[in-house]
Amino acid sequence: MYYVGIDISKRVVDVCLLADGIKGKRKTKTLPNGPNAVQALAEWLTRQKCEPSQAHIIMEATGVYHEHLAYGLHQSGIAVSVINPHRLREFARGMGILTKTDKVDAYVLACYGCLRQPE
């Protein structure tokens, strides 16, 4: 199982793929957030040698911005977990990560998935 953290904003989606757990390689990508985001993400995962069916996507609830992507990924057969932002921030603090940027948030989301393995 590959854990993929996604930080979503109005215009872009920051993605972090953990290939070998939190200590292993991490790959990142910024994709446009729009109608083709699901397809673009699936294609990028495939190029990283991660079949979408082997991925577990972790994202935080961000008002309306996460909904289209979460539903689209779920309909494509990809496992998706939507996490409460407050819970994620406390998790990051517990890891000693106090910086708050989109790329760091994507990494923290991937770590959360890897360590907590949400349903």
Model region roles, listed by residue range:
Residues 1-119:
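Phosphate- and other anionic-substrate recognition elements at nucleic-acid/protein interfaces
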